[in-house]
């Protein structure tokens, strides 16, 4: 979610996604992370949680302001990623109208990985070669410094403009426009693959420019009526473009696939107080997606083109999700109850103009409906303690990526499956939070445990066609995979955090999260389950100086805990899996007057080599970070 608009669209993939980088972090006001199924409020896909990005709003001129113009400039350099980021935003304020404009440009270069291989695998993750195309010939070149991951750099521009209209004392309107576009981005995990002849499998494997355009109008009012006390309505249009460019080593044929997605959305939410201690929230939501997927092959010798199989149905595809929902909040003494229900109707269809695979039909049309609900209980024994119990259901209706995708990764070919049904989650969560003040020490902790049953869970599994698990496609044999509804999945875990503040200027914070997931009957591990991870932070402020020491860590993820197929990127892991790692970062900041803050950081202090779980690229090694923030 971003500013009340769903980012999930018809071609969102399950698992590891990069779409969040299209939201400019320099213009964020907050980021809400909601754990557990949240289908009542957010609908399909909110099966495990919700991330809601909220960008800054323009500010109106008030009586204490001396100027109607204000702004901020930020710049940052990072040595390990060769990053140079620049951001500027400025606010124009009036009594009833205000505008906020933001511009961010980020450029990244080659990435230096850590050299301290505490995991013991001396060659794991090294970038040993790269390819050069010259005079219509590919050449495999040895990397003179295999710790430098060449060619992974990219640049990106993010633009945001929001205009706020104060309609009256109780109502306002915000027009929100956001645009993000990147350069080409290399897939190093594909470019480092070798064939049986020890030659590169690909000479080119790029994501093309990733574009996201959002335009929305948000109206809110607190003018009471019989039906509501507060109303918020958001109407939006999004345009998303993704593309992929691939060429095999020593081939003159470059494959290009382009996906264009348009999304129309509306969400109307109303709130009505009932008496002094209860409130009713209700509303409706509609999202309509269209997908135009095209692919062509470019002959580099004569620049001729020909049509090839597209990633998604080449005759077009769409999804339609209308829903109604309501929740009731009751507060009485030390107890708070929240119950909700949502009904969603889902429709997905696609057309294959030419049967790209013999066993495919001409298309598909799926119609489903889902009923989900939640019941949460909050108990406050005193002012500093909260205990909560949450029972909820969630669902995820198959989208076009689940139903109609054809793509190659490693030695696997994923084929469409139009027989999928929605997967459902039944969740139980129990948690407690506590705050304690003792003289000059403030202590707080929170802990949450969860247990989720997934029914008809969608997983990628092997498939046989005409009695064979292999298929000849694109001049090669591949193992066949397809998204399928499997048995019941069990996901459970525990998360917690502790914060301690000493003498108001020394603060310690720690958090930890553990998750496991398996299919109930076969005991096969589920995909995309991260290992144990956490962080330790120590922050000290002295006058205008701020010192930070940060420790991030991950436990190991061994091979036998990987999901089926290649979803957890087993080819990018070490022989044992993904080793555990920990890194220490340090940072010091200096506040010069009120308008200028300078920061200097040393990240990955001990130059540790590691990969985050399922990553196709090694993380940056020791790096120097310098930044400056100027307010005006």
Annotated model-derived regions:
Residues 279-385, 397:
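Signature of Gram-negative outer-membrane beta-barrel scaffolds
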Residues 150-156, 166, 170-228, 239-261, ...:
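Flexible loop and strand-edge segments within Gram-negative outer membrane beta-barrel domains
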Residues 65, 79, 201-224, 313-319, ...:
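Outer-membrane beta-barrel signature, preferentially recognizing the C-terminal barrel domain
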Residues 1, 17-21, 33, 46-72, ...:
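N-terminal periplasmic accessory domains that precede
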Residues 7-37:
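Short acidic/polar hinge/loop motifs at secondary-structure boundaries
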Residues 81-108, 118-184, 211-213, 275-276, ...:
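Transmembrane beta-barrel wall of Gram-negative outer-membrane proteins
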Residues 276, 331-333, 346, 444-453, ...:
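Gram-negative outer-membrane beta-barrel transporters
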Residues 10, 181-183, 239-243, 297-298, ...:
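Surface-exposed extracellular loop regions of Gram-negative outer-membrane beta-barrel proteins
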